[in-house]
Amino acid sequence: MFKTKKGNLKSLDYKKQDYVIKLSNTDSNNLESVLDSKIGLNNQTRQNNISKFGSNQIVVKKFLIFKKILETLIEPFNLLLLFIGILELIIYFLFQRNWITLISAFIIFFMIFLASIVDFIQEYKAYKFNLKLTKIIENDVFIFNDQIKDFNNLNYQNIKNNLIKEKQSNLTIGDVVYLSKGDIIPSDCRIIWSEDLYLDESTLTGESKAIKKQTTNNKTNFLELENILFKETLIVSGNCLAVVININKDNYSNSLLDLIDDEIITDYEKGINKVTKILIYLISILVFIITFISLLKTGISNWTSSLVFGLSIAVSLTPEALPAIISSNLKLASKRLSKNKVVIKKLSVLQNIGSVNILATDKTGTLTLDTTNIETYLDINNQKNKLLKQYFFYNAYFQNNLFDTIDKAIIDQFKTNISDIKLIDHLSFDHNFRISSVLINFNNSNLLITKGSLEEILEITSFINVNNQVINLCDNYKNMIIDQVNSYAKKGYKVLVLSYKNSDVIDNKNLIYLGMVVFSDQIRENVKQVIDTFKAYDIDIKVLSGDNLYTCKNVCDQVGINSNTSLIGKQINNLTKEELIKISQSVNIFYKLSPLDKAKIIDSLKSNNVVGFLGDGVNDAVALKKADVGISVNNASSLAKQSADVILLEKDLNALEHAFIIGRKTFSNAIKYIKITVASNFGILLTLLLATILFKFEVMSPIQLLIQNLIFDFANLIFVFDNVDESSIKKPQKWNIKSIIPFAIFNGLTQVIISFTNFMILYFGFNIKGLDTYSIELFQTCYFIECILTHIMIILVLRTDKLSFFKSIASKQMLISMLFFSVVCFMIVFISSSFNSLGFKMMIGNFNNINLSWWFLILLGLEILAWIISEIIKKIYLNIFKNWI
């Protein structure tokens, strides 16, 4: 989680260090006096402590206003504009006192301000919005809802009935929290009871080695204190009870926030950066050529005018609004998703969501409901055995697992008296070994009870209880057990079996088989329709499960997932990386998987695919991190939530369906803006290059180029509100930088053709040849208007691969905005022409005995022609490249 700028956290001056060390070295019975609080709080004392100490409010990295402003100002495009603006000021003050040059410089600075302020506002809004989302998805923690009075007899069984769930932010000094494997420490704590406790403290120390923790301390180094749990570290095994000793900003990890550099550049952001560099290089080279040609034609004595003209072209072609538009696009999508109960932890992951073409998911709780029901329990004779029921209950009851739905179902439905039972030891369920054991004192003898999946239990079982007689487990009985279990598994039931023996230790060998319990999962409502929708959007579903093949196949058949191909977890290690990549593409069911198996499968699926993985358990954390889009749910383990990119507030595939669609729409609008902007700018740049060669005058003045760019900037902001064709989101889209150049070359030709058609009409039809100032200004005004309207027409045509206006229409917001900016274009010309400023002249009256008003009718024809040419080029481009946006 933490990537520091300085690197060495141990040197940090932490104001509460001595206090924490003192608590570490204080005996548990004396903690109350040091903490100035009861150890363990009920509702009343908790409220009193919150009033006294405060609560563990979420602390996030500060939004540093001046730093963010500086970051927006030094965006590459803004730096380019800043350089040009300063250069124009130098020209004005030292070489050419032309007020147009001064105004031009101020317009450039205004453009920088505009782009920066929009980007800054979007960043700030995103920050505030993320604060709200952070509170929504904060972790719950189990707390002991009473005072701890006897520190010598603490254990899970004594306290579990008093555990309640509480939001992490509601913790206060003195709260006692129960933590187990996969939990992320919610606040700095002092351990008061532990069992085989190991932590991963790499978030603080950078060392991934598991660190043993216990109730006593023998270390002096602050970060090595053996009974202190630091916020944001992770429990990798065991469990504990710990008292909260720091909250809010006093937590050690929160004091590090200013040292943290948590910015990870995604492929999407790398792509944007690459496009930015390409555009800057392209603009710089071509502007240099245009300036050089202009200089050759006007002479060295007029170098300042040529330079200002070249600089103005550079400004007009610089898409300085790109960061703001991308940011707005992502933020709008994030808001839409939050309304659909989907929380995006990092905005840039939206691009990956739109590109997902494989969704890997667990079966339990996703395709089926989280609740589990017991259908029956049977011994080898297909009889409901009372002893079997009791032993299953003992095994489940004495497990230190608050989240296991299997154990919960057993405890709820197999209630048995445990007053004479004493727990000696236990072995929690492990996804690699797939068994759980308890060692209890029962009827004055020690009894080992182990439950698990069929294959794993049979490997450690040598005997069988038949009619209360223990005999050898021969092949005949073994086959009977397998047939009995499979008869239920084939019907879609989950089956666990149980073996036992008298033992003083947990050694799990030579056990006695007793029987099985059968569980049923209910298919989620409407899940089949959602799966069908995923298929329609070209998303392949892969089931990654720890269950057996029969159970997985039954569920998949019910929800419409192809179950013809499957792969068992133990085969994965026998395959080479290349073999696994090849096989995983065609397999839909992966069963009996360990956490490492899941991660390997996700890794193999990522070859030529964008993979989403939906998981909620501790065992899913590695796979969630491996996936291109890790998806978890709000009630998942804290480790799963931390590892995920996307959090579903409800475990509902419908919400995920909305996420994929909105992700694709967001991606489509972003790429649409980039491609259309590059195409239009390329067309304008090529037009100006050719015009500089062919004409003796500038076809558009520097100030007009800047005004045009301002209009383009405002117009482009509307892209985020555009509709997206259903056909363009039917298939996952990938970020392909290489496609931008051919798209720009082909579709930029429309701008060139229309502009030069306009030039020829003005030059030969209206006899406007730039022989005097008035003639030049008429020519420039006509090009200014035509260029803006053609740009708007190109936007409306290129936004879709369909026949624009007939088979695909832009959103109302976009159409109204484009109409508005068209009107603004004419208003600027009319107003400035009336005041004889900015070099605009209205096409009214006569010029060389020709009625200039006819040009407006020609302009209409030019825009219709622009639409026709754009559609023809679109058709040609699609035939060649087969893909549009």
Short names for language-model regions:
Residues 1-172, 177-178, 183-185, 190-198, ...:
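Non-lumenal N-terminal regulatory segments of integral membrane proteins
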Residues 104-140, 145, 264-358, 517, ...:
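Hydrophobic alpha-helical transmembrane segments
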Residues 198, 216, 369-389, 558-560, ...:
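Basic, amphipathic juxtamembrane/active-site segments
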Residues 40-71, 135-143, 147-159, 209-212, ...:
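Non-transmembrane, extramembrane segments of multi-pass ion/lipid transporters
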Residues 228-234, 352-513, 519, 532, ...:
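Cytosolic catalytic regions of ATP/NTP-dependent phosphoryl-transfer enzymes
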Residues 82-107, 281-318, 331-341, 684-703, ...:
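Helix-interface capping motifs at the ends of transmembrane segments in multi-pass membrane proteins
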Residues 290, 324, 402, 559, ...:
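Membrane-embedded transport module
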